[in-house]
Amino acid sequence: MIPDVSQALAWLEKHPQALKGIQRGLERETLRVNADGTLATTGHPEALGSALTHKWITTDFAEALLEFITPVDGDIEHMLTFMRDLHRYTARNMCDERMWPLSMPCYIAEGQDIELAQYGTSNTGRFKTLYREGLKNRYGALMQTISGVHYNFSLPMAFWQAKCGDISGADAKEKISAGYFRVIRNYYRFGWVIPYLFGASPAICSSFLQGKPTSLPFEKTECGMYYLPYATSLRLSDLGYTNKSQSNLGITFNDLYEYVAGLKQAIKTPSEEYAKIGIEKDGKRLQINSNVLQIENELYAPIRPKRVTRSGESPSDALLRGGIEYIEVRSLDINPFSPIGVDEQQVRFLDLFMVWCALADAPEMSSSELACTRVNWNRVILEGRKPGLTLGIGCETAQFPLPQVGKDLFRDLKRVAQTLDSINGGEAYQKVCDELVACFDNPDLTFSARILRSMIDTGIGGTGKAFAEAYRNLLREEPLEILREEDFVAEREASERRQQEMEAADTEPFAVWLEKHA
C-alpha cells in the first residue's frame, strides 16, 4: 500500500545536505477556564496586550480561546522553549484561570453565550469579530471552541535545487509549488497516521452533543461521558471541527492555479443554507456574506498550502504572487501529556513524515479520489485502535491491515531519520522512530489509549481539571529561558500602539468599508 520510495531515499542519502535548514513554526490554541473547568468570561488578559496585533499571543474564535504562535525557527529545542516561555508568562498573568489541556471543551452548557473574540474598533478588528459571528451562526459556537495545534513546515531551498536543478524566478515558484502539492496529496493519502499516533480526543462530554441524535455507537460512563472504545480523534470527526457543506466544493491539490481558482469560486458561490440565516437582523450584522465561504480562511482542511500575506492581500493572492512558501499541518490534537500541548517527539515525527511526503510519488487526485481518502481517515478517527482494522488505497477495494501499513511506512521513515541525524548529529530522529513504531503492535501506547484510560477513571472533566491544575503550577514556577519579562512588556505596549494606530488611520465608516470587503 505504501509507494516504493527506495530510489528517492537512495537519492536523499546521496544528498543529505538538502535537508539542512528545515524551518518550522507552531501555533497552539487553548481555552481559558476557571478552577472548576468552566469557560472564563473575563476579557483577554491585560498583560498580553492587543490580541489584534500581538506577535506571539492572540485569540482564535472566542475571547477565551488563546492562541500562541512561535516565530519561524530552524531549531526544534529553541522553538519549543519559546512556546513554553509564552505559556509561562501567560500562566503568571491570568489570575486564577487555567489553560484547558484537551482539544475538546467540556463544561460549556447548551446555549451558553460564548463571547466572540474582540479586536477593538478598527475596521479590520470589527471585520474579524463579524467573521466569527458568521461562524457562530453557521456552525454553532461550541464547535468553534475545539482546540488544536498547527505545525508549519518548509523545506530549504537547497532541497528544491538538489531535486529540481538550478531554479529561480517563475520556474522556482512553479516547481516548488508542485513539490508542496505532492506533499499535500501524500498527506491526504497517508496522514491518518497522525491521529493514529497522536489523536487525543476519544471521548466527548454529553454537553457537546447538545441533545442532537448521533449514529455513532457511543458507550456512556456514569458521569455522562460518551466515548468510542477504539477512537483516536473525535475532534477530526463529523462531530468535531469539520464542515460537511464544503465537501462538494471540488477543490483539488494538483496545480496552483486550479487550487486558487477553486478557492476563489467558493467565496463567490452563494449558499441557500446560509442565505436563510440572513445578513442582518435588528440592525446587527449576522455574517460577512451568505456565500459558501465568507472568506478563504473558512475552508476547513487538515493541511493547507501557505504564503505569508502582505498587507491587504488574501491568502490565495499571496499564493498566486509567490507560490507555496510553507505547509500548515492542522490535524494535531492538543497533546494532554505536555504543558504546552505539543512535544519534541511529535515535531520530529512530523519532520520525518513531511520529508517522506515530499519524496514519495503522488499521482494527481481528482476531487472524487480526495473524498475516498476520507474513508481511511474516518476509520482511524473512529476506530483506529480496533484489532483487525484495515485501510484501502484511494477508491480501490483492496484492503491492508493498518499495523502492517504503519510498519512499512516507518521502515522508510527510519531511513529519513538516519539522514537527518547524520547532518544534525546524535540519534534523536531514529529514537523517535523506534518509540513510535511500537504503537502499531501495541495500540495501548498511543495518545488516545493513554488518555482514555484516565478519562474512564475520572471523566473528561476530572482529567482536564487535574492536568490544567498541574500545568498551571508547573508553568508559573518555571523561569523564562529565551524571552525576558521586559520583552513581554515591550510587545504588550507595541501591540497596543499598533492597534491604536490602526483605529486612528480608519477614515471610512465600517458599513462602507465592509461593502468593499464582503
Swiss-Prot record:
GO BP annotations of the record are: glutathione biosynthetic process
Q: Which GO terms describe its molecular function?
A: ATP binding; glutamate-cysteine ligase activity; metal ion binding
Broad EC category:
ligase
EC numbers on record: 6.3.2.2
In which domain of life is the source organism classified? Bacteria
The pathway it acts in is: Sulfur metabolism; glutathione biosynthesis; glutathione from L-cysteine and L-glutamate: step 1/2
Which reaction(s) does the protein catalyse, per the Swiss-Prot or TrEMBL entry? L-cysteine + L-glutamate + ATP = gamma-L-glutamyl-L-cysteine + ADP + phosphate + H(+)
Keyword annotations from UniProtKB, A to Z:
ATP-binding, Glutathione biosynthesis, Ligase, Nucleotide-binding
Gene Ontology, cellular component aspect: cytosol
Which PANTHER family does the entry link to?
Answer: GLUTAMATE--CYSTEINE LIGASE
Q: Which family does it belong to?
A: Belongs to the glutamate--cysteine ligase type 1 family. Type 1 subfamily.
Q: What is this protein called?
A: Glutamate--cysteine ligase
Name the gene that codes for it: gshA
